[in-house]
Amino acid sequence: MSLSVTRENFDEWMVPVYVPAPFIPVRGEGSRLWDQQGKEYIDFAGGIAVNALGHAHPALREALNEQANRFWHTGNGYTNEPALRLAKKLIDATFAERVFFCNSGAEANEAALKLARKYAHDRIGNHKSGIVAFKNAFHGRTLFTVSAGGQPSYSQDFAPLPPDIRHAAYNDLNSASALIDDNTCAVIVEPVQGEGGVIPATKAFLQGLRELCDRHQALLIFDEVQTGVGRTGELYAYMHYGVTPDILTTAKALGGGFPIGAMLTTQDYASVMTPGTHGTTYGGNPLATAVAGKVLDIINTPEMQNGVRQRHDAFIERLNTINVRFGMFSEIRGLGLLLGCVLQTEFAGKAKLIAQEAAKAGVMVLIAGGDVVRFAPALNVSDEEIATGLDRFALACERLQTGGAPCG
């Protein structure tokens, strides 16, 4: 008999690094979730841009079950068919010639930064170890990646931090140019800063970074953990910009909810990595790669990407209508189905309150700092779910603005 659990048990049993919502989801289908009490939610949070095809997609369940009935794991002393097939799909769909599989975005970024340093050390010299990243970025929670992320609140308690990492202002080419020099081995950047406020890079900024990296023999790393796998209306966001990185990291939506990450690069850069220089126990796990292969099959189609662009327009239109009514947002921005509503000054710091009211109204949204409400719904969310979810979001906005009784 299963143990009966409640939200209060989290506070009793779990390390307190999260503050989960007061409800516990127990079942999902498409873009809808139901909690222990049977209440329905429209899911515009998407597991933080993970559930690209919603919950319990039948094709993903089939791929997982089929592989689960074969075998689950062997470790990196052996390869497997699903991993090789997924690698080939990623290579065929991108600039990449080599793939490294891992379990998360943080691990993918850790691998990318290690590769960049090793390439510079082997090909140029040990002096070339500098990494340039950007303020308000987020690249993961390992000590290396949290140091590269330009948010001191995430790293300040863990000193001493890895050295030779400097941070420029995002979308400011002059700021980046002042830091990138011949001692720089890598520049790591998000095409859209997700945790930093859903801020898309300008084309001129990314093109300028590409030119600076070429000039100083530094590798350009695109962190596409949040923007990748169709989220922006292209398979990867770099395709919007006409700027090709040397290394790309991907995770989140790649597994559609099953943990997986990957680092993509070229044969030349990958060649400095030899057996033992890096590794992972679970990376390339056949369960994860079987599911991810099916995710790519579904998402990497013109129909899906056109659908993301159409759904983007539907969200923007309805969010603008909500804003005309309530005047709460100074800007609505983003690419594809990664969107952020920036709060007006009078509502500054209240993004979390809006998210809480939204949940009471029956819609799940995210935040990106205290001033931005973030949306990362499934890429196949229906028109009806968009309409219903944003009607519920409007109710939450009304409740917050008027100070009325809580929703629900």
UniProtKB/Swiss-Prot annotation:
Gene Ontology BP annotations: alpha-amino acid biosynthetic process; arginine catabolic process to glutamate; arginine catabolic process to succinate; ornithine catabolic process
Keyword Transferase: yes
Keyword Transferase: yes
Catalysed transformations (reactions): N(2)-succinyl-L-ornithine + 2-oxoglutarate = N-succinyl-L-glutamate 5-semialdehyde + L-glutamate
Name of one Pfam family that matches: Aminotran_3
N6-(pyridoxal phosphate)lysine: residues carrying this PTM: K252
GO MF annotation terms: identical protein binding; pyridoxal phosphate binding; succinylornithine transaminase activity
Pathway of action: Amino-acid degradation; L-arginine degradation via AST pathway; L-glutamate and succinate from L-arginine: step 3/5
Entry keyword set: Aminotransferase, Arginine metabolism, Pyridoxal phosphate, Transferase
EC nos: 2.6.1.81
Cofactor: pyridoxal 5'-phosphate
Superkingdom in the source lineage: Bacteria
Protein role: Catalyzes the transamination of N(2)-succinylornithine and alpha-ketoglutarate into N(2)-succinylglutamate semialdehyde and glutamate. Can also act as an acetylornithine aminotransferase.
Similarity comment: Belongs to the class-III pyridoxal-phosphate-dependent aminotransferase family. AstC subfamily.
Designated name of the protein: Succinylornithine transaminase
Protein species of origin: Salmonella paratyphi B (strain ATCC BAA-1250 / SPB7)
Name of the gene encoding the protein in the UniProt record: astC
